[in-house]
């Protein structure tokens, strides 16, 4: 796809043109001394295809890294103690998640409107008492 655009010498040529999703490289060719002729050629970029299975779901670690970590843990703790260690780590993570949820709900929780109403009603009662004592004097 080729587009020819003529621009007078006094106008400004944009330094960057918007890219579309499938065409992103633009080639600029200029010619003619009186009028700048801009020829835009859009080049199609080849997308890379990744081979193999990649999973970056656990702290940005891939499958091979997780396998190595599991193997080292099995060697360090042994097959008998490994389930106990896994359970304790799971319980710790669960308690941290529960604490985070509780903290989040406390932050999101609005103050009770009944407390505000009771404070306002007490102030009104005090104002009424003050105005009634002024009337009596």
Swiss-Prot record:
Where is this gene product found? Plastid, Chloroplast thylakoid membrane
Targeting presequence: 1-54
Q: Lumenal topology: which positions?
A: 55-56
GO term, biological process aspect, one: protein transport by the Tat complex
Q: What Pfam families has UniProt attached to this entry?
A: TatA_B_E
Q: Does the keyword Transit peptide apply?
A: yes
Any one Gene Ontology cellular component term annotated for this protein:
chloroplast thylakoid membrane
Output one GO MF annotation. Answer: proton motive force dependent protein transmembrane transporter activity
Mutating residue 65 to A/D/Q: effect?
A: Loss of protein translocation
Membrane-spanning intervals of the chain: 57-77
Sorted UniProt keywords: Chloroplast, Membrane, Plastid, Protein transport, Thylakoid, Transit peptide, Translocation, Transmembrane, Transmembrane helix, Transport
Tell me the membrane topology, using the record's own terms: Single-pass membrane protein
Q: Where is this region: Disordered?
A: 104-137
Does RNA-binding show up as a keyword for this record? no
- So what family is this one in? Belongs to the TatA/E family.
Assembly with partners or alone: In thylakoid membranes, TATC and TATB form a large receptor complex, containing about eight TATC-TATB pairs, which binds the precursor protein. Twin arginine signal peptide promotes pH-triggered docking of TATA oligomers to TATC-TATB receptor complex, inducing a conformational switch of TATA that results in activation of the translocase. TATA dissociates from TATC-TATB upon completion of translocation.
Q: Which PANTHER family match?
A: SEC-INDEPENDENT PROTEIN TRANSLOCASE PROTEIN TATA, CHLOROPLASTIC
HAMAP family named in the record:
TatA_E
Q: What does this protein do?
A: Part of the twin-arginine translocation (Tat) system that transports large folded proteins containing a characteristic twin-arginine motif in their signal peptide across the thylakoid membrane. Involved in delta pH-dependent protein transport required for chloroplast development, especially thylakoid membrane formation. TATC and TATB mediate precursor recognition, whereas TATA facilitates translocation.
Q: What is this protein called?
A: Sec-independent protein translocase protein TATA, chloroplastic
Species of origin reads Pisum sativum (Garden pea)
């Amino acid at each position: 796809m080729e587009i020819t655009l003529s621009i007078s010498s006094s106008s400004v040529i944009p330094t960057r043109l918007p890219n579309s999703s499938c065409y992103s490289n633009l080639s600029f060719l200029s010619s003619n001394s009186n009028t700048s002729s801009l020829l835009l050629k859009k080049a199609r970029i080849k997308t890379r295809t990744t081979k193999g299975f990649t999973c970056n779901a656990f702290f940005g670690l891939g499958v091979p890294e997780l396998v190595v970590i599991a193997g080292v843990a099995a060697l360090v703790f042994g097959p008998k103690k490994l389930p106990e260690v896994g359970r304790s780590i799971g319980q710790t993570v669960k308690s941290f998640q529960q604490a985070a949820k509780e903290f989040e709900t406390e932050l999101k929780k609005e103050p009770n409107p009944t407390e505000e109403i009771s404070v306002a009603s007490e102030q009104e009662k005090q104002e009424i008492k003050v105005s009634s004592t002024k009337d009596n004097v």
